[in-house]
Amino acid sequence: MVSKPHGGKLIRRIAAPRTRERILSEQHEYPKVQIDHGRAIDLENIAHGVYSPLKGFLTREDFESVLDHMRLSDDTPWTIPIVLDVEKPEFEEGDAILLYHKETPIARMHVEDIYTYEKEEFALKVFKTKDANHPGVAKVYSMGKYLVGGEIELLNELPNPFAKYTLRPIETRVLFKEKGWKTVVAFQTRNVPHLGHEYVQKAALTFVDGLFINPVLGRKKRGDYKDEVIIKAYEVLFEHYYPKDVAVLATVRYEMRYAGPREAIHHAIMRKNFGATHFIVGRDHAGVGNYYGPYEAWDLFDEFPDLGITPMFIREAFYCKKCGGMVNEKICPHDEKYHVRISGTKLRNMIMRGEKPPEYMMRPEVYEVIRSFDNPFVE
């Protein structure tokens, strides 16, 4: 059976059509709060159950419990604070407010809690550093002075150019059941696939019924692959190198926090809500720079025996000239001089120079997809 939703119930916080119509007709009567793109995406993920069991942004009790214990106040595992910040609240506890992204009302929120917090404490506990060069820490330091907690009802979603590739948890759960999959392994990615990724995915697929490739779409930094390139690259990989009906590709919009081990747990919870029973935890999962050890995230899973999804720890793959194929350090006896590490950065630089990567690094069909774009990279 596909996994149970985190907390036992798949959350749905979408305003019914008549309620939505009434709220929008009365929108001038509500206090108005502007939110950024990331919070709008968080609202979608709350509303569609990706963040189950959350029904809204964290109250003080849950926020402090997540910081200190990596659990909600009811002891449910939860590692990343999903919060709404404001600089100066112009409303009170008990009020209903409307959350806007630019001119679009995204959600109604029932204000349960307004509270202050220490930014350095937030940063140190979640990211294990107070260094403002860390992108997640920099984001915390730019937040408003207050946090607002309470349940939400989604009214509108941001435009989604990849809507046809988007599946919600309620849809993936039905799809996995229709395929007869009792076990499903999820793989998160922000890159086009190379042979190292394929090795890890197929190693995991050996032990389960189906593979769920779940690319993260969202704001990217300069030099990253564009979202459409990642999607097209996986489509051609599935067509040529995977058996039919063993893999599903569906995207999710999400703002990366780069919180390393804590975020690895969060990513597993998200995929549990999609119905996955297993989750591939990569090397330096959700890390950035040198803030976390390469396999630090693996150790943190030991603290969550009640997580409800099984982590799969598959070591980084490389090409061995002696073995003549993709291997990892556990199964290859040969000296380092025979190993060719497949670095995403190295591949990206080769492609930028117009060089075709060797076939032991990247499938030629994937390279042709990348080459078909005038500029496959974010500028």
Curated annotation (Swiss-Prot):
CDD domains: ATPS. The keyword Transferase applies. Pathway: Sulfur metabolism; hydrogen sulfide biosynthesis; sulfite from sulfate: step 1/3. It comes from the Archaea. It catalyses: sulfate + ATP + H(+) = adenosine 5'-phosphosulfate + diphosphate. The keyword Cell division does not apply. Its EC number is 2.7.7.4. One of its GO terms (biological process) is hydrogen sulfide biosynthetic process. Keywords: ATP-binding, Nucleotide-binding, Nucleotidyltransferase, Transferase. Belongs to the sulfate adenylyltransferase family. This is Sulfate adenylyltransferase. It comes from Pyrococcus abyssi (strain GE5 / Orsay). The lineage of its organism: Archaea, Methanobacteriati, Methanobacteriota, Thermococci, Thermococcales.
